[in-house]
């Protein structure tokens, strides 16, 4: 479960959000809706431990994300809107990433790529935007984390 209580966050002197409280229960799929600049990406980064709130608390199960506990980190994955994949393939990308996630399932990755009709050995820079998004989603799903945070997965 993800529990957020009285969370504040600002960049320099510009408040992004103030005093928000939310609860995300296990086994559900949630979506964050809002205009650009209201803090959706920032909230995902706080939940994943990549940014730190100014005030308030964020708990994921019994962990405080900002403490970067190794067990916590292997059970959550944040897929940003844009990923720099440079001159590599989904196969090489997931092989480097998967070592950090004990439940990573390479067979599942290959099955997803086949189902999505994307070649795991094509370079990202030769793919269409849609193929790249599908490939990154297959990578994320194959990590088998308890929490999967997707920023603009279909954009």
Where are these regions (language model features)?
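Conserved structural motif at the start of ABC-family nucleotide-binding domains
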Residues: 2-4, 17-19
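The feature captures the beta-strand-to-loop junction immediately N-terminal to the Walker
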Residues: 33-35
